[in-house]
Design a protein with these regions (language model features):
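Charged docking surfaces used in two-component/phosphorelay signaling
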Residues: 13-24
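His-Asp phosphorelay/catalytic-motif detector in bacterial-type signaling
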Residues: 2, 46-48, 73-78, 189
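Positively charged, aromatic-enriched patches within helix-turn-helix-type DNA-binding elements
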Residues: 145, 150-215, 219-222
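Basic, amphipathic DNA-recognition helix from helix-turn-helix-like DNA-binding domains
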Residues: 66-71, 76-133
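Conserved acidic carboxylate
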Residues: 9
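Short hydrophobic/Thr-rich beta-strand motif most characteristic of the beta2 strand and flanking loop
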Residues: 26-34, 41
Length: 229
């Protein structure tokens, strides 16, 4: 069965180009020029991945990303921004909203397909088929689920991989570059600053006090370590 990808792009020529190359790569593709319609259909069909332009009718792509991340049915689906906005501030904002990759226009169709495949691989395969029980924190790698004190915590695919990787090496200090190599192997999207963004997002989700984290500790001048209780 082919994986379904939703492309939300109001430029007809770009949408056709993206659809053509993704279908050659054996994906099923649905194209939307309107954010509101895309979200309604996404709740029904639950696509494997979203490709979003930022500037689209019916609500911008950033708001659509927020809506996807707040949806019980869609929150774990990977999101790639495909946009003409190439500034660092736009990239960081995309990260903070939960995007898994960011491709700027103009782009190579071949690279686009490669990046889609890379993101789907990261989403589909947890690092280790096991369960971490760490105090109040529960990480189920088989089911790709996180809970704190029994309450489910919604994470993106990349957030899950980062948390899983750190939890499998408690006490070990990782530099930002080491985490980039281990968790984001296949993408040029992230920078050392991006790691900080993901750590902050995870702290907000799993820590009782994100300003004084119990699990995800900062080691000044070196990077981060996971502290097992």
């Amino acid at each position: 069965m082919k994986l379904l990808i939703f492309v939300v792009e109001d430029d007809v020529d770009i949408a056709r180009l993206v659809q053509h190359h993704l279908e050659i790569a054996r994906y099923s593709v649905r194209v939307f020029a309107n954010a509101a319609r895309a979200l309604v259909d996404a709740e029904k069909y639950k696509p494997a991945l979203f490709l979003l332009d930022i500037m689209i009718p019916g609500g911008d792509g950033l708001q659509l990303c927020r809506n996807i991340r707040s949806s019980e049915n869609l929150a774990n689906r990977p999101i790639i921004f495909l946009t003409a906005r190439s500034g660092e501030a736009d990239r960081v904002l995309g990260l903070e909203l939960g995007a898994d990759d960011y491709i700027t226009k103009p782009f190579s169709p071949r690279e686009l397909v490669a990046r889609v495949k890379a993101v789907l691989r990261r989403f589909d395969k947890p690092l280790t088929p096991m369960v971490h029980e760490l105090g109040d924190l529960h990480i189920d790698c088989e089911r790709v689920m996180v809970s704190v004190r029994g309450e489910p915590v919604v994470t993106t695919a990349t957030e899950f991989r980062l948390l899983d990787y750190l939890a499998r090496h408690p006490g070990r200090v990782f530099s930002r570059d080491e985490l980039l190599d281990a968790v984001w192997r296949d993408t040029a999207f992230v920078t050392p600053r991006s790691v900080d963004v993901y750590i902050r997002r995870l702290r907000e989700k799993i820590e009782s006090d994100p300003e004084n984290p119990q699990y995800l500790r900062t080691v000044r001048g070196m990077g981060y370590r996971f502290e097992a209780p």
